[in-house]
Swiss-Prot record:
It comes from Fusobacterium nucleatum subsp. nucleatum (strain ATCC 25586 / DSM 15643 / BCRC 10681 / CIP 101130 / JCM 8532 / KCTC 2640 / LMG 13131 / VPI 4355). An accessory protein needed during the final step in the assembly of 30S ribosomal subunit, possibly for assembly of the head region. Essential for efficient processing of 16S rRNA. May be needed both before and after RbfA during the maturation of 16S rRNA. It has affinity for free ribosomal 30S subunits but not for 70S ribosomes. The keyword Chaperone applies. Residues 93-166 form the PRC barrel domain. GO terms for molecular function: ribosome binding. It is found in: Cytoplasm. GO terms for biological process: maturation of SSU-rRNA. GO terms for cellular component: cytosol; ribosome. The PRC barrel domain binds ribosomal protein uS19. Belongs to the RimM family. The keyword rRNA processing applies. This is Ribosome maturation factor RimM. It holds the Pfam family PRC_RimM.
Amino acid sequence: MELLIAGKVLGSHNLKGEVKVISDLDNIEVLVGNKVILELADSQQKLLTIKKIEHLVANKWIFSFEEIKNKQDTIEIRNANIKVRRDIVGIGEDEYLVSDMIGFKVYDVKGDEYLGEITEIMDTAAHDIYVIESEEFETMIPDVDVFIKNIDFENRKMLVDTIEGMKESKVKK
């Protein structure tokens, strides 16, 4: 059973336990009535049933889960990835979503230098931007042919061609 990331919980929406979710799925409403896995920040997982989905704006949605009854219950699922079986949303084995690339290992074609893993994909007006993090650097690479040289879904790997200034030292928190 192969899972895909259907969305990410942004935070609570109201006192009734509904949450705001961002998703790049076109047919997200098919998830209503299905069980999904929420991958929590501490690497734990929670199995929940989607009761209702309402469109908010653009790629943002309001989700209601059977098991969540109030705002307090939404705290632990904030920033959780929502994972679902691929077949539920009609994604074939040879089809991919942008969110499937989260966790890909990224290498620079110059010297095959390891840059880190894709941790986020930002949707901008012009193109997506891949956020790549390692222990030392955070790199943002636009999804344009000049920089993206190869995407290998089978090995979960991306080859990029960076330019000076793309890698930034991480700020210690």
